[in-house]
Structure formats: C-alpha cells, structure tokens
A protein has these predicted regions:
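Extended, compositionally biased repeat/scaffold regions that form elongated interaction surfaces
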Residues: 23-251
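Secretory targeting and sorting signals
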Residues: 1-27
Length: 251
C-alpha cells in the first residue's frame, strides 16, 4: 500500500515518455494527465497552469485526425497538422460553448486558427476558425459570423464599426431565400439575387415596419448612399430614402 501511494505521487508530478500525439515525440504528466507536443507548447505559451488549471483529460482524437485536450479552467486546446502550420490553439468559455453548439471542429467552422483574443475595442473576445469567427461581448454573448456576411462586417470595421457586435448567429430568413446576422447597430443580409449588404438606422427601421424581405421591397441590393439631400438605399422592389431634417424614411 505504501509503495502504491509513492508510485502514484511520483507519476502525478512529472514523467517523460514516447508519445504519438500532436506531432511530437515526448510528453509530460501534469497532475495526472499527459500533456505533450504542440498542445503542450500552447499550454505553456498561454500561461500554463495559471491560465488552464489542471488537464481533465488526456489528449484525445478529434475530427480528421486532429487532437484536443480539455482543462479545468473552462478551456480546451485543439491541434491539427494541416491547420495554421500545425500550431495548436486554445478556445474557451462562452466561445467554446457556442462552437460546441454548432458542432465543434467537425462542422462548418472547423478548427480554431487563433487563440481566444481580445477585440481591438477592448470590450470583447473572439476566435477565428477555418470557416468563420465567433465573437463575444458582455452585452451580446457569443455569436458566430461567417462567409459573405463576415466579409461585409470586416469591410465596415468589425466590432469597431457602426454595426458593433453580432447579436445573433447567422440565420436563415423565414422564406428560406436568404441569410442574415443582426448586430448592435444594424443587420447584414445576404441573398442570391441581392448580394450581401448592411442596413441600419431609420432605413432599416422603415424596412422592418414594412415586413423586411417579405415585403414588396424584398432584399437590399446596395449599401446606403447620399442622394437628393438625403440617404438612400436600393432594394429589389424599390428604394428607401431618409431625410435628416424630417427624421423620416420614405419609400
């Protein structure tokens, strides 16, 4: 019995072995679980035990021959040889929860290609993934944005632009002919016929009051632009113009 206790304590502190995971040849045991290779590199690069706490699993197989490991402080590290030059990345908290809801690395977002990072405005956090991004802020929680909608949002300054943070995931429109994300300061809509366009302010309010894309206006086909002393935006079925002095948007 004394020998067994002594052996367990020795293993729990540190050991090195031949290891076939995450592109490495050696690994160590930290508090009872093996951590090795690129996952171990990320573990130490991002602060080690102070950031992650104890490993709660050994390294496990992920989709498409990747690897991952789960840690006590609500975080995981994921690795794939073909992603970001084989660098392992951390994903945690509400962002990890959202990623999990959407199907983890086996779904459209794929593997993380960044660690969780602070947003330039200092108010939120994000991870970029192979297929898109997840952004979190205290006011909006975590939401996914990808594809043409993400590209448009990026063109307009990400979360530092007029639109702010996403307040929904990308969703299918009710009639299933388009996609959209709502943001703190507006929306971005995509349709095959109209392309991808942002819409905000009084023009968005008026469009919404008419029934959104289900109205006779249908989907936006342009960004807003100056015209006739006001601000105008074109749609499949017409235009909406907003005049600052009156504060009214007219079709």
């Amino acid at each position: 019995m004394k020998f067994a206790k002594k052996l367990t304590a020795t293993i729990a502190v540190c050991a090195s072995v031949t290891f076939a995971g995450a592109g490495v040849s050696s690994a160590k045991v930290f508090h009872g679980h093996w951590i090795g290779g690129r996952i171990e590199e990320a573990y130490h690069r991002l602060g080690g035990w102070k950031t992650f706490g104890d490993a709660t699993t050994d390294e496990r197989v992920a989709k498409n021959n990747g690897r991952f490991q789960v840690f006590a402080k609500d975080a995981s590290i994921y690795w794939h040889a073909g992603v970001d030059n084989g660098i392992a990345h951390q994903v945690g908290g509400r962002i990890r929860n959202k990623w999990g809801d959407l199907g983890w690395e086996g779904a459209a977002l794929g593997y993380p290609i960044t660690d969780e990072l602070k947003t330039p405005d200092g108010k939120g956090r994000f991870n970029h993934f192979q297929g898109g991004s997840i952004y979190w802020s205290p006011e909006t929680d975590a939401h996914q944005v990808w594809g043409g909608i993400r590209d448009k949002w990026a063109q307009q300054g990400w979360e530092t632009g007029e639109l702010g943070y996403p307040t929904t995931d990308e969703l299918l429109t009710p009639e299933k002919t388009g996609r959209y994300n709502h943001f703190q300061g507006g929306s971005i809509y995509w349709s095959q016929a109209g392309g991808v366009h942002s819409i905000s302010g009084p023009i968005r309010d008026f469009w919404g009051s008419q029934g959104w894309e289900r109205s006779s206006l249908k989907f936006p086909t342009s960004e807003k632009y100056a015209a006739g002393g006001g601000i105008k935006q074109d749609f499949q079925g017409g235009s909406i113009q907003y005049f600052e002095p009156t504060g009214k948007a007219l079709e």
